[in-house]
């Protein structure tokens, strides 16, 4: 099972089967990763359709909906190779947030500041990890905002401050990518899965594999799970 689901995915499957309280989700197999590379670093239509079918299942189980302004589904997207490779590959958190879902998160938690903090972090993480927009561009804007508001720490920024930062971050994204920040969570998900697959071949992962004699051909699985701790 570990060969197909990766170490993390196999562990999650075993815990779920044992009735342990594990956040709901699904695993995209190592075979999908090797197919991604075989197809010229593209996720083919069959795998895409399969991913979206599992998203529907996750929505049904959780009662949440991707992009919903009342009860949004937010997920984490994490790598999971057969053999543990700590810190070598990429993770994306709170995927599913957009201009509608952030309002749903604010209402559901009764905490707009928390919602917009999650959103600005997601935009920055997605831009950095998925699209390789330099993280420093966002950090500069955070520092500018804190200076303008006369505060020293991120936690001192208000919900309105963070909402303004979201707009600034989305503009940075569009200026660098030549297109708006994706509002469709399904588009976000496919791009995030590609990023995790790509990270199997990043320089630090390649060095780690060589040092630990992990075959390149294994590929990595991707674990998509409900962010139960958020909403």
Labelled PLM ranges:
Residues 1-223:
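N-terminal beta-alpha lobe that positions the nucleotide/phosphoryl donor
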């Amino acid at each position: 099972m570990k060969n197909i689901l990766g170490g993390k995915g196999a562990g999650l499957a075993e815990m779920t089967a044992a009735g342990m309280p594990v956040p709901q989700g699904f695993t995209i197999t190592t075979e999908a990763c090797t197919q991604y590379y075989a197809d010229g670093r593209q996720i083919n239509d069959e795998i895409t359709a399969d991913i979206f079918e599992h998203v529907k299942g996750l929505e049904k189980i959780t009662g949440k909906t991707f992009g919903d302004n009342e009860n949004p589904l937010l997920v984490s997207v994490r790598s999971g190779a057969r053999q543990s490779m700590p810190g070598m590959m990429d993770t994306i958190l709170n995927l599913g947030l957009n201009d509608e879902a952030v309002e749903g998160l604010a209402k559901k938690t009764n905490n707009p500041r928390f919602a917009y903090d999650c959103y600005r972090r997601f935009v920055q993480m997605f831009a950095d990890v998925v699209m390789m927009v330099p993280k420093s561009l966002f950090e500069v804007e955070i520092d500018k905002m804190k200076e303008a508001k006369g505060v020293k720490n991120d936690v001192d920024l208000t919900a309105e401050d963070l909402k303004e930062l979201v707009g600034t971050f989305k503009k940075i994204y569009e200026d660098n990518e030549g297109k708006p920040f994706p509002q469709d969570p399904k588009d976000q998900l496919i791009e995030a899965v590609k990023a995790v697959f790509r990270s199997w071949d990043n320089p630090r992962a390649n060095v780690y594999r060589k040092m630990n004699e992990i075959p390149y051909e294994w590929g990595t699985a991707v674990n998509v799970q409900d962010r139960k701790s958020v909403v």
